């Protein structure tokens, strides 16, 4: 139904409308009110934009306003030669190229400041890193949120809890999944929630992987969303903040691409799964 009609706490009708997402529909609703401002009648339905006629005047205004945006978005910031699974869904399911390169960029930025790992949630990523030229517009599509890079201290226990929480959705996949650089982990998607992670390792300064130590303190570059407890990541909200760079994750990625392009080596796996014994 359009609109959905509910009752307000006072018993008056409340009209609720939605047009889904991705600008597919334009809402259209005509409402009549009485003297008390209470809706008395209504009529309308969402209009599919593909069928809506355009306005030449509005199109002209949009085109004029779009010129500087198009120029900015077409600016090339780097090049990628790697083809691998990537995009919104892959970044919520396991390793994905955009998250691997982004966390590498975060760690590259923060390592001189003492960081040994970089963490961000898979839900941050909304597009794939294109193969070929990478533009500013691609970066905006990839990381549309204004997440910032923070430097924080965490115990190994807190990092383990974050990884565990990251795979607590159905089948271990979802936006809360931890994407990382300098850290890798293995989990069982069929194990009980809270008991899925089988191992977590951290890479030392010589490139060797060592088991995460619960009582050791690690410095991490982490997205502000996670550090604020986003996606219910309580463990990451509990860290001790060292600094707030003020830099957007997207800007750190852009600087990294300018420095490291072309991206030509497929990153080593960081998220692995194991099957539970059948018990037969």
Q: What feature does the model see in each segment?
A:
Residues 16-20:
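Short beta-strand elements at the ligand-binding edges of bilobed clamshell
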Residues 40-61:
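Short, exposed interaction patches on small structured surface elements
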Residues 21, 32-36, 43-49:
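Surface-exposed loop and adjacent secondary-structure segments within mature catalytic domains
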Residues 75-95:
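Glycine-rich phosphate/diphosphate-binding loops and the adjacent beta-loop-alpha structural elements
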Residues 61-65, 124-125:
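Active-site neighborhoods of metal-dependent hydrolases
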Residues 4-15, 25-28, 35-42, 96, ...:
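Feature captures C-terminal
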Residues 63-78:
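Acidic, glycine-rich low-complexity/disordered segments
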